[in-house]
Amino acid sequence: MHGGQGPQLLLLLLATCLGAQSRNQEERLLADLMRNYDPHLRPAERDSDVVNVSLKLTLTNLISLNEREEALTTNVWIEMQWCDYRLRWDPKDYEGLWILRVPSTMVWQPDIVLGNNVDGVFEVALYCNVLVSPDGCIYWLPPAIFRSSCSISVTYFPFDWQNCSLVFQSQTYSTSEINLQLSQEDGQAIEWIFIDPEAFTENGEWAIRHRPAKMLLDPVTPAEEAGHQKVVFYLLIQRKPLFYVINIIVPCVLISSVAILIYFLPAKAGGQKCTVATNVLLAQTVFLFLVAKKVPETSQAVPLISKYLTFLMVVTILIVVNSVVVLNVSLRSPHTHSMARGVRKVFLRLLPQLLRMHVHPRAPAAVQDARLRLQNGSSSGWPIMTREEGDLCLPRSELLFRQRQRNGLVQAVLEKLENGPEMRQSQEFCGSLKQASPAIQACVDACNLMARARHQQSHFDSGNEEWLLVGRVLDRVCFLAMLSLFICGTAGIFLMAHYNQVPDLPFPGDPRPYLPLPD
């Protein structure tokens, strides 16, 4: 057992000695490099030398885009490379040591900051170590969570896309002191934001369409001042509108459809129609308030969804106005309003045929003349009309009464005539007719009075029915008009969003895709 532990102890002591020796070499190298080293001085052998600083941005997470604050929050890794002639060494002098890890606060830094931050945090999240190679080149990859400003265009919200950027510049050095440039790989400049598929977390609201990078010179800032040169990383992102479609647009469309369906209520139910339309209007106001809390408070543009909600509110208000007008027309009567001939022709003949509506046909002219004769009457008290006219004007009960009355008189005359032309019987017959004449006349007058009253009531009911039919036709016309307006307006507004697509190329007029070449 003791013999098996001997080799293990020997290997452990050998590894400890080698580690201590290697650590001693790093300590010795670090002590040699940091001797008389000043991290505040620019690493230039001559004053005219320019230090080249390369930048590369790796995006790990697009956290959020706050539309109201116009702030983009991202989680990134900033890769910076530069060379410091004071940190060179010969690996042979340090037993082949090729990489030295040095705290970033101990070496000179190019003072690169995010120029368009919104929270005042210019520094990285963690000052990790830098990697120094024997030729003095430094590689630094600190992580950072940045909140950068992003101008929001709300014109097509929620079917919009935004162009955000992260602007990096040196806070203290001008173009004559350092030269900012994009990192290179295989002789090609990395003109895009690098995304590692294994480390990147997809955002649930935004999709990245383009991610170019550019080196820009600010024409406003003089070249001898800091901030003249900038490295800008762009993010062209498109919103995923499913959340707003499901939670705002679809419920609003369904609620607005209820306002359209109130036309299926009777024309006289104007009060119920106005109540339903008012409730729909209140619901649309709530949706508009929810949208207003999401978008920035700007007067430069009106969001597309706000335009649509306003359009639906206008349609609902028009429906309320239509309901009031239809109710006013439906409750008219011949005593208050006389129907013009043109109104009767358009709303009772022409439009019902076009709309395939079933309305009661208008009475023929012969019946109208008979009604006038019945109202005027004759001097003898009998209405001057034919049998066909009477059949068309009088109700069935009055026709039966009049028929029995006529049959009784004829039957009495026939009975008197059957007994022969005796003088006595003729005189008795004439006397009986003379005695019965006032009673018959009173009966006839009473029948004519009842007929006139019945006719007046029938005329009044017919007038009410005509106004009600006009209201029905007007209600149907308004329904078709509002339905067409609702469909066309909805389709037109959302077709505007369909044509608002992210361009195929990130910069107009520049044919380069700013993406890595395919393998």
Swiss-Prot record:
Coiled-coil residue spans: none
One MF annotation (Gene Ontology) recorded for this entry: acetylcholine receptor activity
GO cellular component terms, semicolon-separated: acetylcholine-gated channel complex; neuron projection; plasma membrane; postsynaptic membrane; synapse
Keywords: Cell membrane, Disulfide bond, Glycoprotein, Ion channel, Ion transport, Ligand-gated ion channel, Membrane, Postsynaptic cell membrane, Receptor, Signal, Synapse, Transmembrane, Transmembrane helix, Transport
Compartment annotation: Postsynaptic cell membrane; Cell membrane
Reaction catalysis annotation: K(+)(in) = K(+)(out); Na(+)(in) = Na(+)(out)
Gene3D superfamilies: Neurotransmitter-gated ion-channel ligand-binding domain (2.70.170.10), Neurotransmitter-gated ion-channel transmembrane domain (1.20.58.390)
Biological process per Gene Ontology, one example term: acetylcholine receptor signaling pathway
Glycan attachment sites: N52, N163
Extracellular side stretches: 23-240
Signal peptide: 1-22
Disulfides per UniProt: C150-C164
Parts of the chain on the Cytoplasmic side: 330-476
Topology of this chain in the membrane: Multi-pass membrane protein
Function statement: After binding acetylcholine, the AChR responds by an extensive change in conformation that affects all subunits and leads to opening of an ion-conducting channel across the plasma membrane.
Similarity comment: Belongs to the ligand-gated ion channel (TC 1.A.9) family. Acetylcholine receptor (TC 1.A.9.1) subfamily. Gamma/CHRNG sub-subfamily.
Known partners and oligomeric status: Pentamer of two alpha chains, and one each of the beta, delta, and gamma (in immature muscle) or epsilon (in mature muscle) chains.
Name listed for the protein in its UniProt record: Acetylcholine receptor subunit gamma
UniProt organism field: Rattus norvegicus (Rat)
Gene: Chrng
